[in-house]
């Protein structure tokens, strides 16, 4: 299964190996979640100040976070679904703070690769509708994350 992923690096510090890691882990997740070929998403790498601005402007949270997901398939109030058109499935946008990912990798005592893969996967699952607002939803989402990370070889 192939995803079309548009990568945007606003930090100018993301190595090609990290882009490839994310492409591969999200490809594995898409395969395990049975996402159709040609589905699209974007992944943008930012600094803490930029992710803080996005949080403040769109989520009313004036602080940096590690990853933000904007799902295209979530219908907002007053929005209408476009049906019948032969268009690729647009999953949405992931925004990852590179400095925050580095901080958390150190904090949790694992590699930057593992943290970056985890954050990309976590955000991707949000794009697919997974959430962790209730205990039951959290158990389902975190269980699925663990399965995919282990299948990919990035388990703890």
UniProtKB/Swiss-Prot annotation:
Lineage: Bacteria, Bacillati, Bacillota, Bacilli, Bacillales
Subcellular location per the Swiss-Prot or TrEMBL entry: Cytoplasm
EC numbers for this chain: 3.1.-.-
Chain residues that bind Zn(2+): 122, 126, 132
One GO CC term on file: cytoplasm
Identification of the protein by name: Endoribonuclease YbeY
A Pfam family this chain is assigned to: YbeY
Cofactors, names only: Zn(2+)
UniProt keyword terms in alphabetical order: Cytoplasm, Endonuclease, Hydrolase, Metal-binding, Nuclease, Ribosome biogenesis, rRNA processing, Zinc
EC class: hydrolase
Protein purpose: Single strand-specific metallo-endoribonuclease involved in late-stage 70S ribosome quality control and in maturation of the 3' terminus of the 16S rRNA.
GO molecular function: metalloendopeptidase activity; RNA endonuclease activity; zinc ion binding
GO biological process: rRNA processing
UniProt cross-references to InterPro entries, sorted A to Z: MetalPrtase_cat_dom_sf_prd, YbeY, YbeY_CS
Protein family: Belongs to the endoribonuclease YbeY family.
Chief site of localization: cytoplasm
Cofactor detail note: Binds 1 zinc ion.
């Amino acid at each position: 299964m192939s995803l079309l992923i548009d990568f945007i690096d606003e930090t100018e510090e993301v190595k090609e190996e990290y882009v490839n890691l994310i492409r591969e882990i999200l490809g594995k997740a898409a395969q395990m979640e049975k996402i159709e070929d040609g589905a699209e998403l974007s992944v943008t790498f930012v600094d803490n100040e930029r992710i803080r601005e996005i949080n403040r402007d769109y989520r009313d949270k004036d602080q940096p976070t590690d990853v933000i997901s904007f799902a295209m398939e979530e219908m907002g109030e007053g929005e209408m679904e476009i049906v019948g058109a032969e268009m690729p499935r647009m999953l949405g946008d992931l925004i990852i703070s590179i400095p925050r990912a580095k901080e958390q990798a150190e904090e949790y005592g694992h590699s930057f690769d593992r943290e970056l893969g985890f954050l990309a996967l976590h955000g991707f699952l949000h794009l697919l509708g997974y959430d962790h607002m209730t205990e039951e939803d959290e158990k389902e989402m975190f269980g699925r994350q663990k399965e995919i990370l282990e299948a990919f070889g990035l388990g703890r």
